[in-house]
Amino acid sequence: MLKSLLIIVIVFLHRELCDGIQLILFDNWPSAQNVCASAVADATANGQCTTKSIQKHLELLTVIILLKLFGVFHRINQQHGCSGDNSVKSASYAINAVASRTSGELDFVFVGPTCTTDIRTIGDFAEIWKSPVIGYEPVFEARGVQELTSVINVAQFSVGGVAETLVFLMKELEQVEITLVGSVKVLPNGLSLSNDLRSYNEIMNSFKIREYVEVDENDVDWTKVDQKIKRGARMIVVCADFYDIYSAFYNIGIRSLSGFRFIIVVILNKPPDEILNQPNVKNLLYGSNAFIISPLQEQYSDAFSIMQDVIPNLADDQFTTFLRIYHACYAYCVGSVNGAETQTDNYHTAMSGKAVTTKYGTFTFDNSGSVLTNYAVFTINPAEMTFESILTLKSVAKSCDTYNCFQLSPNKTSDLLWTLKDMDPPDDCVAKSSCVNYIPHIIAAVVIVTIIVIAIVIIVKQRRHKLNIYKLTWKVPKESLKIIVNKNADAKMQRELENRASNTDNAAALTSRRRVFGSYALVGTQRAEYVQFKQIRKINFPETTLDYLYSLKQLQHDNLAKFYGIQVNDDIMTMTILHTLVERGTLEEFCLDRDFGMDDTFKSAFMRDILKGLQYLHKSSIGYHGHLQASTCLIDINWVLKLTLYGVSNFMSDQLDAENIKVPEQAAHMITYPQYVCFPPEHIREYDDSGKQPPRVVRGSPKGDIYCVGMIFYMMVEREDPYHLIHSVERPNATLIKQILNENHMPRITDDYRQENMLLEMCKECWDRNPDKRPTIKKLIESISTVYPLSKGNLVDQMIRMSEKYADELEQMVAIRTADLADAQMQTMRLLNEMLPASIAKDLKNGLIMPPRSYESATVMFVQICDFNALMKRSSPEQVIAFLNDIYDQFDTVIKRHDAYKVETTGETYMVASGVPHENEGRHIFEVAEISLEIREISYIYVLQHDKNYKLRIRIGFHAGPIAAGVIGIRSPRYCLFGDTVNFASRMQSNCPPNQIQTSEITARLLFDSHEYKFVKRGIVHVKGKGEVNCYWLNEHLHEETEPPLPPMTPVPNPLRRGSIVPLQKA
């Protein structure tokens, strides 16, 4: 009572001293005054507040000072929340008394109060005083929106808005009833979401509430709550008006309810970033796939940052309240500047439909004086654990009915969880709490069965592996092994050197280059390189050795020469280790040959090949190479580097140590001295400086392989032997061995700046005496990529990139070289397209992988030149080559006019296919028929330049059917065809008489319906592998304009009618 009297006295004194109090702020937070002052200041700066309003704001601050002098806070409501003595109502009565004494000369605009119930009380008095109330907390007025016209609300939330949003969500999910869950107690602002929502629905009857569950957080039996919820509707609507939201959600069990296929909906009166921002609450909601209905606050984080400029210590749960206070004070100015003064009717009219723009965004009033609020339905984004909008509903003003002056316009932003409507409803046992969860039992059974299956698979694989070990697949029988000694090796070597010296064409020299072998082995029909020892006694291999040799036999890699096996324990008393023979040359020969231009392309490709093969070995069960030298790096015919003699050095050392074998006395040194000093010091054995005995086999290890890689890379970069000992095979230098072992001696590296210096520094790291400090293969690969950035991939890839590089360089040259550039580009693409079909070549060039595939129907044709061997005997090689080039070029010209592809030419045979890789919808048979007729016409008129009397005769056969095709080969890819259709077409050609085009009856019938082709029935022909086949000859294409003469025909005996040619009889 004393408080009310003080307020009356203070207001009366201010009335006598000042022009009047216009703005009264109800709030119990000290920062509210700053926010309100900020709003008035911003409105003034934006020209939305009158000079009189500014004076009134200053008068408000004066009243605040007077209140403080009397020991009374400037906020009329002194209580926290909405409990205790109702001071707001007391203050309202006091102000009413002052207003009565001043006979209406004192006008008021009320902002607030915090309690929603008190807004109704203040609003009722304001109706009498004709003073407007700007509320910033949501109010549900059961009497209707037109019954409280003195209240203008900026709360940006309404019970009707969330109710209509819920109705729309229910329609989308095809639900007609809900279970409503809320707190018995109200929120600090006096709002009870669940009670107001139920009251609204009782009036509007928008949906059916099957169960209404009120929860008293201080005294609750959660078991009963759980049973009541499960007996209710499938859609459970939880109003988040709890003091401890996490505990309430956890005890309600929203995650388990979601597991029972209930639909969880959470309703908030503020944005989720403010109420549900705790990580544990987010995790709980994400696990339940809950929908969250709340007001939509655009750019929440930006607005929060702006508010922190006014209130530095702003808490997460205070933002919306202060934002509403700001909007209320700002609206006070906007109403005043529009001439509304402080009269209720004028203020209400001025603000209806008004759009107000502030630094926090724009808000618009409807016709009832309430702010139009947009709503959203959120879910939890699992990737970032943030709130993601899946549905927004925009409020649009409309003519007011009893409770709403707006309608919602929905917009779906995601279809993430709308599939919930297709899920089955909860089981009946859920409501009875009688469900039995069999999932743990099923999981346990699955785990046990899986363990048993895995154990069985492991046991079977181990047993099968053990059986394979004892099959001795690596053992080469002596009967299939034959050693071939090349007695003319020295003479061949001399001729090879002379050819290299005399051949100035580097490309031709590289193509023709071959190794000269003193001897080699034949394993069956396959040639192999070998290392042979004299066997002293029979060797008993333990199981570990058998397993090792079996694993060695199973190795398969593009950069490894195949390990054939070992011949051992035979009566010839030798042990022979065999690998695939690679003919072109060793890396050592190429490195030391100064005439060979080893540019960055070759270096990078060979280095990568070495590391790829070595990486495969290190990751396999073999684990090492052991004999890695430039001489054991072999270059094959396709310029692919392959490693040989891998994984056997430790095996050979063990047998030598056990004296089971020995090096033959007359055999050449297995390891030359220049190779010996390039092995890692930790594996070098003592060397016989007398030179009478060859070095022992050196053991190997993965770290030792890295040391040898450094030596090989040094040789490739410097193009010389690391220790300049290439001619020191006969007399070793024992001093050098001791320097390497004891003085850390290593190859000399100059200080000259070069691009490859980084690689040489990496070589020095490879030679570190501590094996653990040597670089890894991955690091070596990275160094190669750094040193040779433009050389990547294998040689085929690099050749393509080199062509593109050269093309780019040529384009920048002067006009005189433009023609050369175009020619180089044309030749590059022509060569590529000769190897592969154009579409396949293009895809491979773009780095795509071309998997093999099958074609339902395609046509394959073979053309063979008759009497080719006789022609070769009476012609020189140059004349034969010129003839083949000439005739095949004419054939190629025919192919280019049709949808077909030349697969390959082999001697006198020419192979064509249509329908692959480009499927032409059945046109392939007609394309090949046309090609065959045109090629035969060429043969009729062809004149051989060096033999004018020679008559060219050809055999043509084709067949249509299913086919398989794919790119074979990685280093030298070719597009190959497979299948019975290819074999059948080949048989048609081989069984065909000269100057005829032969096909089977099955293929001929594909051309019958066109009525454009004339066939002759040959009859039954015995075809190898096919049996008796009814064959036809294709004679001509019946064109409309003219009919070309029939080709000459060679009578062939027919099994059905001898000496006759039977016209085709269509079925």
From Swiss-Prot:
All residue ranges annotated as the Guanylate cyclase domain in the record: 859-989
Mutant lacking the gene: phenotype: AWB sensory neurons show an expanded fan phenotype caused by membrane expansion. Increase in trafficking and localization of tub-1 to AWB neuron cilia. Increase in PPK-1 and PI(4,5)P2 at the AWB cilia membrane. RNAi-mediated knockdown in AWB and AWC sensory neurons results in a defective preference between different food odors.
Tissue note: Expressed predominantly in AWC but also in AWB, ASI, ASJ and ASK sensory neurons and in I1 interneuron.
Range of residues in the leader sequence: 1-20
Chain sites annotated for binding ATP: R515, V516, F517, G518, S519, Y520, A521, L522, V523, K534
Known catalytic reactions: GTP = 3',5'-cyclic GMP + diphosphate
GO cellular component terms, semicolon-separated: non-motile cilium; plasma membrane
Keywords on record: ATP-binding, Cell membrane, Cell projection, cGMP biosynthesis, Chemotaxis, Glycoprotein, GTP-binding, Lyase, Membrane, Nucleotide-binding, Olfaction, Receptor, Sensory transduction, Signal, Transmembrane, Transmembrane helix
CDD domains membership: CHD, PBP1_NPR_GC-like, PK_GC
Cytoplasmic topological domain: 460-1067
Compartments (UniProt record): Cell membrane; Cell projection, Cilium
Domain-related comment: The extracellular domain may not be directly implicated in the detection of volatile odorants.
Function, in words: Guanylate cyclase involved in the production of the second messenger cGMP. Regulates chemotaxis responses toward volatile odorants in AWC sensory neurons and their avoidance in AWB sensory neurons. May be involved in sensitivity to quinine by regulating egl-4 activity through the production of cGMP. Involved in phototransduction in ASJ neurons downstream of G protein coupled-photoreceptor lite-1. Required to maintain the expression of putative olfactory receptor str-2 in AWC neurons in adults.
Protein name: Receptor-type guanylate cyclase gcy-10
Organism: Caenorhabditis elegans
